[in-house]
Amino acid sequence: METTCGLPVLPQKISVNFMLRETVDDLGLSKSVTFFLLNSPIMLRLFQRTQFQGSKTCPRVFSKSFHSLPFLRQELILKVEPLKRDNESEDVKRRRLVYQSRKRGILETDLLLSRFAKRYLPTMSVEEMEEYDDLLNELDWDIYYWAVKNYEVTPLPEKWKDSKILAKLQEMSANNEGEILRMPNLDDSP
């Protein structure tokens, strides 16, 4: 049987409603919810459209086989472009980069980037801030694995091989001083 995205490609003559009923019955939902799911034209169209679509590659990709319903078990690919910030003052850019370094959502990356921003951001030139801004637009786990030089998990792209900012981040991430890592305070007080 031919497959697309790991799902069987079924002839259109097979009843979509039958497959949807089989899936919904397995969920153990209330009768009213089950009735809605089985009789909703939106659900039928969603099922028909999502079942056979392939994926496209994008520069920045969030990919996850995220759903337990078989007809939704496919890769979800979203292309997220960073916001263009024209005429951003140097001070505003520094503050934004501090915020973006601290509020990533993954503890390991938060710790490394917040310490890096505290140590190096106040003395960065505009060009270095642009490079750091580009680095922050990468995925969190990619940044983390590049910072700790674990290229087996996430290979380092050519774009970052000669990066001075990434080299500084890697040097700081090595933690040769044996310092216990914690999120630095925003102000200068201890």
UniProtKB/Swiss-Prot annotation:
Q: Name one GO cellular component term.
A: mitochondrial matrix
A Pfam family that this protein carries is Sdh5
Q: Which UniProt keywords apply?
A: Chaperone, Mitochondrion
Is Chaperone there in the keyword field?
A: yes
- What InterPro entries is this protein classified in? SDH, SDH_sf, SDHAF2
Keyword Lipoprotein listed: no
Q: Which GO terms describe its biological process?
A: mitochondrial electron transport, succinate to ubiquinone; mitochondrial respiratory chain complex II assembly; protein-FAD linkage; tricarboxylic acid cycle
As for family, the record states:
Belongs to the SDHAF2 family.
Q: How is the quaternary structure described?
A: Interacts with the flavoprotein subunit within the SDH catalytic dimer.
Recite the other comments. Answer: This protein may be expected to contain an N-terminal transit peptide but none has been predicted.
Q: What does this protein's UniProt record list under function?
A: Plays an essential role in the assembly of succinate dehydrogenase (SDH), an enzyme complex (also referred to as respiratory complex II) that is a component of both the tricarboxylic acid (TCA) cycle and the mitochondrial electron transport chain, and which couples the oxidation of succinate to fumarate with the reduction of ubiquinone (coenzyme Q) to ubiquinol. Required for flavinylation (covalent attachment of FAD) of the flavoprotein subunit of the SDH catalytic dimer.
In Swiss-Prot or TrEMBL terms, this protein is called Succinate dehydrogenase assembly factor 2, mitochondrial
